[in-house]
């Protein structure tokens, strides 16, 4: 596996079929913001057969220091913890080599899900642990 910069077409094709798709992770959304003050990068983790296994877009600005935003989180199978861990490792290396000083991310997965009787139905704390391992720090969670 390796992390590469995807073309707009590669990213668009992947983002349209992914189950975690959201408007923040679309080419159209980045085109709106690119004209403002941001540059866009489409990053993907590919296997040996060039299949995209995970991807994200990074909006970056370079006003003295290089900062990035990952809106809507990654387009990845969050239930595959090994894949998420590998993606985070490679992404952190990419960000360091690309001289990013700060990157904020607002993932759209739920931390914990409860029913109306306050019984825990879904616990995604392991995802948070993986993100924390690579110094992605959460500021708030959605519990539903």
Predicted segments, located by residue:
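A structural signal for well-ordered alpha-helical scaffolds and beta->alpha junctions
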Residues: 4-8, 88, 124
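Alpha-helical transmembrane segments in multi-pass membrane proteins
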Residues: 120-127
């Amino acid at each position: 596996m390796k992390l590469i910069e995807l073309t707009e077409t590669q990213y668009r094709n992947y983002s349209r079929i992914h189950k975690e798709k959201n408007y923040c992770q679309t080419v159209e959304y980045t085109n709106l913001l690119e004209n403002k003050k941001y540059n866009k990068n489409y990053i993907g983790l590919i296997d040996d057969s060039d299949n995209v296994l995970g991807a994200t877009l990074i909006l970056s600005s370079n006003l003295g220091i290089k900062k990035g935003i990952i809106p809507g989180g990654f387009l990845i199978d969050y239930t595959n913890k090994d894949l998420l861990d590998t993606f985070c490792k490679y992404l952190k290396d990419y960000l360091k080599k690309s001289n990013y000083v700060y990157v904020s991310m607002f993932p759209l997965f739920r931390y914990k899900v409860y029913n109306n009787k306050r019984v825990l139905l879904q616990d995604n704390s392991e995802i948070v642990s993986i993100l924390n391992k690579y110094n992605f720090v959460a500021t708030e969670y959605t519990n539903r």
